[in-house]
Amino acid sequence: MPHVPHDAPHDAPHDVSRDASHDAPPAAALAAQAASILVRRPDRPVLVLQQVAEDGPAFLATWLQAQGVAMDLRCAEAGDTLPADLRDHAALALLGGWWSANDDRAWLRAAETLVRQAVAQVVPTVGHCLGAQLMARALGGTVGASPRPEVGWQRWQVADSATARRWFGAAPPERVFHWHGESFSLPAGAQLLASTAACPHQAFALGPHLAMQFHVELDAAKLQVWAADRSPEYLDLLAQHPDSVHDSMAMWADASAALPAQQALAAHLYTRWLAGCR
């Protein structure tokens, strides 16, 4: 994700509710599949780890609230602390951020400890971008530079497997949203679920746990902030990698169809995630 200043100017958002016909069939199919799965409402809150201010839970928070599921949000940049264990939480979610998973930060190492506890105790865990990289590191994988950075709506290839269909549905959308320059190797025992032309490891599953390099939690408000990025780092990436790094106009133009479809995907996989709660 971009390192967006808190006072960054916002571009006028495109109306993503219009012109959504391109990805409408996958979105409708995923919505129907999600509706057919009984959402488990755990009696304990979901622990959500937010690393930086610009990368909040967005659609994840909206979806949890709509399902009546309590969320315990802890943000590193806000000065929050992490619990020592997961006994008071039914599930774990890790968000993204502009930090590297390899940074020497006590918060990141504590987050990895919680991931290992979650796997050992079968507490279902979902990771987004940096959160997925932390999951990979915690479980024995490595994180390093991606073959090419990815920014914007990218086409992806979903594995032809029962596990991939379980998480992403029988008709996943054509594109998902990315903002990353690093990626992960697969931990031992993990199953690769998706890839892109620029990054072969996009998602993996390990039992009831899912790690994704992309941002299914994106909503229009978050996209508005991210698409306003004019940092030298982003502009350099845009100039050097025009095939895999998109500008703000492309992000908004593609969002008309891609964002509703991705949110249907998110609802589906979040439902599967909570289905693993004990």
Indicate where each model-derived feature is located:
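Short, hinge-like loop/turn segments at secondary-structure boundaries
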Residues: 65, 89-93, 142-146, 162-163, ...
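Catalytic nucleophile loop
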Residues: 117-142
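C-terminal helical/coil "lid" or tail adjacent to the Rossmann-like core of SAM-dependent
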Residues: 207, 216-255
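Pocket-forming structural segment of enzyme catalytic cores
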Residues: 139-225
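N-terminal beta1-alpha1 cap of cysteine-dependent amidohydrolase-like domains
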Residues: 1-5, 19, 25-123, 240-278
